[in-house]
C-alpha cells in the first residue's frame, strides 16, 4: 500500500452510536488514527458545518433527510496537528487514505461534498470504512465515479464495534490492509 506523501482524511461521528453506545471518539476516527500512526501521516477531519446531533435517532433523521434530498452539506477541514491550511496539505499530497462510516450502505453526504469539491487528478485514494454489517457496500465504485482522474485502490472495512473496543484487532486489520 502506498504511504509516502500521504494524508489520512476521515469523517466520523461522536455521540450516541448504533452498536456501541455513547462514544467520545468516532469509530472511523479510531481507525484513521491507527492508519496515520502506522504510516507516519497527518490526519485531516471532514467536519460538517451543521454537526449531527448526539442523540442517535436525531442524527438518523438528519442524515436520512440529507440523503433523500441529495444534499451536499457544507464542511470544514480540520488538521489533526492544528495546521492552518489542511486544504493545501491535500493539494500537495499524492495519496489520500479516505475514511468514513457506512450509513444505509453508502457514505455520509458530507463525504460526497468533500469528494466533489476537489480536483483529484493524479491522486491515489485508498478508502476505508467502519460499518455494522454492510462492509464497504458499493462505496468504492461510488468514489471511482466521483474522483475523475484519480486511482482508487481496493478498500478496507472494519466493524465499528471492533474499531471502538478492540485496538489489537484494529491494528491487525490495518496492518493486513497496508501490507
Regions found by a protein language model. Name each.
Residues 128:
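Thiol-based oxidoreductase modules, predominantly thioredoxin-like and allied folds used
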Residues 121-124, 149-150:
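A short helix->loop->beta-strand "cap" motif at the edges of active sites that frequently abuts
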Residues 1-95, 105, 112, 116, ...:
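N-terminal beta1-alpha1-beta2 submodule of the flavodoxin-like/Rossmannoid cofactor-binding fold
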Residues 133-146:
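Glycine-rich, charge-decorated loop segments at or immediately adjacent to ligand/cofactor-binding or catalytic sites
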Residues 151-179:
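Glycine-rich phosphate/pyrophosphate-binding loop and the adjoining helix
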Residues 107-111, 136-139, 166:
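Residues at alpha-helix caps and immediate loop-helix transition turns in enzyme cores, especially N-
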Residues 13-16, 49-51, 102-106, 131-135, ...:
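Solvent-exposed loop/turn segments at secondary-structure junctions
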Amino acid at each position: 500500500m502506498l504511504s509516502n506523501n500521504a494524508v489520512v482524511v476521515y469523517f466520523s461521528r461522536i455521540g450516541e452510536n448504533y452498536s456501541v453506545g455513547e462514544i467520545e471518539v468516532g469509530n472511523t476516527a479510531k481507525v484513521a488514527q491507527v492508519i496515520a500512526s502506522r504510516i507516519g501521516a497527518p490526519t485531516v477531519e471532514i467536519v460538517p458545518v451543521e454537526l449531527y446531533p448526539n442523540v442517535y435517532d436525531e442524527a438518523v433523521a438528519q442524515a436520512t433527510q440529507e440523503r433523500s434530498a441529495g444534499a451536499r452539506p457544507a464542511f470544514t477541514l480540520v488538521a489533526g496537528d492544528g495546521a492552518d491550511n489542511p486544504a493545501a496539505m491535500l493539494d500537495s499530497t499524492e495519496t489520500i487514505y479516505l475514511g468514513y462510516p457506512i450509513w444505509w450502505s453508502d457514505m455520509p453526504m458530507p463525504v460526497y461534498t468533500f469528494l466533489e469539491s476537489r480536483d483529484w487528478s493524479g491522486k491515489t485514494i485508498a478508502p476505508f470504512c467502519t460499518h455494522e454489517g454492510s462492509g464497504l457496500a458499493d462505496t468504492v465504485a461510488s468514489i471511482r465515479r466521483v474522483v475523475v482522474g484519480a486511482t482508487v485502490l481496493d478498500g478496507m472495512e472494519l466493524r465499528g464495534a471492533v474499531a471502538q473496543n478492540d485496538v489489537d484487532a484494529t491494528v491487525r486489520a490495518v496492518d493486513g490492509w497496508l501490507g
